[in-house]
């Protein structure tokens, strides 16, 4: 009597497992990047209120706020914004306006709140005036000082924001 083969052979199962392993090896790092990008997007959304305040201040006064430094609320107060520790998010520690050039800085929380790829990272939004209009460029080095050991999160910024 002839026996019919049913099911998969061992080699076929091993090939399927190998293919799944290769797909997982590619997909997991891409997912990690996606999570980091989404968390950076939250920070940029939180900074949009400060961007509006800086633009309105510049339109009315003809200059950016002065006498500001990192970690103090002098600029936030001049712009009518709440203190920097009040502008927070799930992944963002604070948003502050610093320097006499209208730079907006946002710092991400430490892990596990923020993804380890961006934890404690700093993003700077730098305004540039072009004949009456203001454009914004993002980086993570304009506010980086010796007391910040920040990761390079430039690759997680949206393409519309990069310098």
Language model features: what each stretch is:
Residues 59-163:
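Periplasmic/extracellular, small/polar-rich flexible segments of pilin-like filament-forming proteins
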Residues 2, 18-20, 27, 32, ...:
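Short, functionally important structural connectors and interaction interfaces within domains
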């Amino acid at each position: 009597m002839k026996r019919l083969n049913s099911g998969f052979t061992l080699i076929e199962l091993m090939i399927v497992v190998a293919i799944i392993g290769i797909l997982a090896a590619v997909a997991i790092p891409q997912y990690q990047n996606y999570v980091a990008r989404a968390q950076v997007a939250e920070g940029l959304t939180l900074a949009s209120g400060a961007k509006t305040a800086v633009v309105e201040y510049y339109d009315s006064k003809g200059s950016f706020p002065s006498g500001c430094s990192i970690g103090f609320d002098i600029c936030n107060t001049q712009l009518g914004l709440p203190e920097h520790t009040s502008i927070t998010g799930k992944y963002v520690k604070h948003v502050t306006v610093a320097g006499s050039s209208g730079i907006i800085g946002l710092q991400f929380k430490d892990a596990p709140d923020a993804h380890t790829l961006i934890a404690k990272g700093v993003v700077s939004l730098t305004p540039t005036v072009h004949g009456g209009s203001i454009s914004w460029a993002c980086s993570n080095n304009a506010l980086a000082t010796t007391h910040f050991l920040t990761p390079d999160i430039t690759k997680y910024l949206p393409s519309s924001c990069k310098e």
